[in-house]
Every structure is written in structure tokens, then in C-alpha cells.
Amino acid sequence: MSKAMEMLLNALFPPKCAFCSVRLPIRQRICVCAECSDKLPYCRTEKRCSHCGKPAESGGMCKACLLRRNYTAGITSPFVYKERAKDAVVAFKKRDNAYRGRTLSLFVAEMVRYDFGGVDFDGVVSVPPRRSRMNEEKYDQAECLARHTARRLGLTYYPSVMRQVGDMQKQSTLSHDARFDNVRGGFAVRRPDRIKGKTLLLIDDVCTTGATLEECARVLRESGAHRVYAATIATTLL
């Protein structure tokens, strides 16, 4: 895109903060207002679990990660799922707010570099949406985020690597243990040849219990992936 065209588009559609939607100066390329930048609930300021990255009172692995088998090699998120970060994630689920993905991916990519800087990734994949959601929205926010994140990290995005199989309830309506049962066997890999022997970065919007990320990682690894790390925009508290 030419500089003149970019200026014209910015004039017609002024950038908005990805977190509070306030209008920003036309020349501002990172779409976060000064107030949100200061008040966002960053994870990096917290003591965190060494595996799932959730804020924890002490260092090392949290109890939840210790008590289960983990298929991801690690999970990271730039924000705690609350306040302005939560508002941004909820808004990002709607197609009209897909523009937020460009800015949110900046924070995700930065956190991936911070926590997994020594990892040599081969590519990026995304958690597939529930079929019922795709029928309603025709929009996949995890794919949108993954594409932007891959671009920022200089990695290849592998589209449509996974798909949902069978029926699955909405995770947010279930208890902690029920979420793991709900997703068990709920995903399959379409193209094992694309991921065989590869170290992958798996992207989703939110990490709550980690059930979806761990199940996707299990399926990816059993289909030939060498190692799977995961990243989301935000994570809930333990």
C-alpha cells in the first residue's frame, strides 16, 4: 500500500484504540491510547506459573499444571483476562472488530519473544472454532489473531490445519473438570504432512483452564508435530 493511500484511509477511517475504542491521532501506528497503555493488566508484572503463565503467588509450576499431563511445552499471554483486556477480547470476537487483531497480535508476539525467545518455531496454527459459532458469525477470531501474530514473528501461518469433530458444548458454561471432558476427542488434524516434525505456535484468544489448548496440542503431537507452544491474548486468574 502506498503512503498516500495509507494516509487517505487513515483520514477516512481514523484509527481507534484496540482496548477502549477512543479515536487516535492519524499518524499513530500502534492503536493503543496512553491511558490504556498505562492501565492494562499486564501478565509480565506478576509472578507466574512456569508452564501455563498464569499469575501465581510463588514461582515454579502451579498446582493445576502439576496435577495434569501437559501436552503444550508452555503457554504465554500478555494480559490477565480482566478490565480493559477482557473488554478487548470480548469485542474482538465480533467480525466488526477484526481490526483489533493487528494491535492485539503485537502484544502476543512480544510475549512470545519474551517467554519463548530461544525457540526455533517452524510455523503458527490456530485453535479451530466451534462449528455452531462459525455458522453464526462466519468469522474466526483465533485465525485472525494467528495470521497477524505469524506476520509479526516472521513465521508461516498454516491455515485450516485442525478441525472440530463431533459435538461440543460451549466451554464457558462448564466447570473446570467438565471443560477437559468436553474437548476430549473434539479435534482432528486435516493435514498431518504440514506439521510433521515441526515446532508449532498454537494461537487462541483466551486461556481459562487450558483444556482446549492442551487437547489441540495433544492431537497435533499425536499427528506428528515435534513440540507445541501456545499463546493467547489473555489468561484468567488461577
List each model region and its residues.
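Glycine-rich phosphate/pyrophosphate-handling loop used in enzymes and phosphotransfer proteins
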Residues: 1-238
